[in-house]
C-alpha cells in the first residue's frame, strides 16, 4: 500500500463552529477563522470574522495586534463593527506562524481566560505554508558523532532490570514496578503492565512531562495493557515511580527547575540522562520475550513529547511515534524572533546555546523514520508551534499532523480544544494494536442485516416471536405471540419515526400458558435465531425505553446451545432507573451475577425515555459497548480469562424483549411484593399501557477484522 508522507487533519469537531468565545459571556464577540484548520497559502488573505451576540453592541474599542511567530508586530487595529460583525485581515509572502492578540475595551475585566490565551485577551492562530517551515539553525556538525559516543557509553552499562510484581487495578492485567540502570549510576524507574497469561504483544513506551515531580498512575499503563499492549511508563527523573505525593514534594527544589541543570556543558546536561533513559527503555522492551518482535510505539505530551521525538530519532526500533504539543522544538528560535519553547534555555548565553543545540528535538528529527502522529496548538506559547512544525517537516517516515488552531498548551486547553488529537490518538492506538496501518482508511462496514420496521407487519422472515410456558429469572410475565404485546406501529405511536417496533407489557391476570402455568402479565420477546446469525461485527439498535421501577427491557446477543457455554452479550439492559443502562457479558464461570458488567449514567438532561442508539462492537479479542457512539464499557479477552473460557467466537443471534420484574430488578430495587422486582406503582403503569419499548431500527454490520 502507498501511504502519503503527510496528512493534515483539521481540529474542527465542533470547536471551530462557534469559535474562540471569551469567558465573558453574552456581550463579547466570537471569532471565526476563514479556514477552519487555520492553514493558509503564501500571499492568501488570512482572516477572522468577529461576531457580536444578536442585539449586542460593542461597548468601546476592541483592539488587536498581529504578530509574526508571536513576536514582531506586522499589523494592528481596532475592530470596526457593522451589523454586529467586524473583520481582522492580513497576508504573508513567506512561511510563518501568526498570532493575533485581541484586547477588550477599557473596564472589561471578564474577557478571555487561560484557554483563549490568557485573562484579558483572546489569541487567534494561523499558519502560512507551515510544511515549509525549517529549524532556525542547522545542527552541530558533530551532532551524530556526539550521540553515537553516548550510546556506546550506555551500552557498556548493564541493564540490571529489577521487576517487582504488584497488585493490578484491572482484571486480567499484570502490573509491576521496574528499575533499569542508566549512565553515571543513575536509574530509569517506571511501571510495566501486560495482558495476563502467555502471548506476545506490541509494545508502547509512555514518556512523561517533568515538572513538578509526581507519582505515575497505575491506570496509565494498565489501561493500555487491557487493550493488548505490553506497556511501559517511565519517570523523567531519577526517582521511584510509585511513592506517595509527599515524597515528590520533599525532593530538592532544584529538581523542579531541572531545565536549569547542566546548561553550560553538553556532558553535564540533565537531559543527557533523561534522553538515554528513554533509549534504554525502548531497548528493554525489545529484549523482552513477550514483545511481538514488530511494533514499538513511543508516545508523550509536552516534555514527554520532547523525549519521544528524541527516542524515535535515536532508536530505529521505534515503529510508531505519537506526540502532542511536544516541548523543546527549535530551542534557538528566540535568536531569530520566534516564540521560545520550554525548557526556555537562555540561548543568548553562548555556552548555553552550544549545549542546547545537542538536545534540540529539531536536530534529531531527520533520523525519525517511524510512522508519526503530531498534535500542535497554534496559540501554544509553551511548545511554540513553529518549532513543532520544523521537527515534523523533517520526519522521513509517513506522518500526520493534527493542527489545533484555537488550542494553547494542553494543561491550559479545554477538552474540546484538545479533542482532535485525543480522538486521533485513540484511533491510532486501536489500529496499531490490531495490526492495522493507522494511515489506511477504515474499511467501510458491510450491512449484513437491517430492519427499520416500516412494513405493515413484523417481518417473520427475520424474526421469530417467542412464547414461554414457565418462569425464567423470576420474571413475572409470560411471553406471548400477540399483536397486543408486539407489533409494528405507524404514525404518532411510532414516536416520530416512519415506523417502529412496539413491545408492550400488559396486565392479564390469570393468564394460563399452554403448559398450565399462570401469570398476571404478558409481554413480547423476539429473536433472529436460525434466520440471522453472525460472528463478530457491530450490532446496534435505536430504542426508546419506558421509565418504571422493575421494567426490564433488553437488547442482547446469544449463541445457540447450552447456556452459559454459548456466551451472552448484553448490549443494553435497564431495570427502571431512567438515569442509566448497563452492559454485560456472560459465559462459563462468569454467568448470572457476572463480574463483567458496567452501568453507565446518561449525560445531564438525557435519560432512557429519549431515543438512543445502543451498540456493541464485537471483535475476536474484545467487545466495546457504546451509547450514541460513546464508549461506555470494554471487555477484552484478557479480562475474561481469570473467570473462564472466552465464549465469543461462535455465531450469535439478536434478541429484543421487555421483561416485567425478576431477579435482576429485585437485586436493584429490593422489591419482593406485590411481585418480585415489580412494585405496585409499576403495576399501575402496566395496567394503564405505560410499559412500552419502541425500536426504530436494528442493524448488524461487519468489516475486515484483523
List each language-model region with its residue ranges.
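N-terminal cap/lid segment of alpha/beta-hydrolase-fold proteins
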Residues: 34, 38, 155-198
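Short beta-strand element of the alpha/beta-hydrolase
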Residues: 200-209
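Cap/lid segment of the alpha/beta-hydrolase catalytic domain
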Residues: 210-276, 330-341
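Gly/Ser-rich "nucleophile elbow"/oxyanion-hole loop immediately N-terminal to the catalytic nucleophile
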Residues: 257-302
